[in-house]
């Protein structure tokens, strides 16, 4: 089992991922409710993912589902600045 290393703070990366998802969702003319329904999560969960400064863990599977629903490559959702 992997031991959690508390020396890393990924808040900014989660924020960028959330911004990316929101950007492509809006570009697809979808509401949070519509996208959430397409990928099988609650609107509140999607809202938390898109919210700035919220460390909302999301699975790779969910990233793939969101990317497919938005018709974008998954890497575009997780592309973050180093």
Locate predicted features:
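Short C-terminal boundary/hinge segments that cap the last helix of small helical domains
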Residues: 71-82
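Short coil turns linking two alpha-helices in DNA-binding domains
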Residues: 31, 42-45, 59, 73
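Short basic helix-loop element that most often maps to the first helix and adjoining turn
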Residues: 20-38, 63
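A short, Lys/Arg-rich alpha-helix, primarily the initiator
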Residues: 2-27
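Conserved hydrophobic/aromatic packing and binding residues within compact polymer-binding modules
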Residues: 21, 35-36, 46-49, 77
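Short, basic-rich loop-to-helix N-cap that marks the start of a DNA-contacting helix
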Residues: 53-68
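Recognition helix of helix-turn-helix/homeodomain-like DNA-binding domains
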Residues: 40-56
């Amino acid at each position: 089992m992997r031991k959690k290393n508390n020396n890393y703070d990924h808040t900014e990366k989660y924020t960028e991922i959330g911004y990316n998802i929101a950007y492509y969702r809006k570009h697809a003319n979808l509401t949070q409710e519509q996208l959430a329904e397409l990928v099988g999560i609650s609107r509140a969960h999607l809202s938390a993912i898109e919210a700035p400064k919220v460390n909302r863990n999301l699975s790779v599977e969910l990233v793939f589902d969101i990317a497919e629903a938005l018709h974008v490559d998954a890497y575009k959702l997780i592309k973050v600045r180093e």
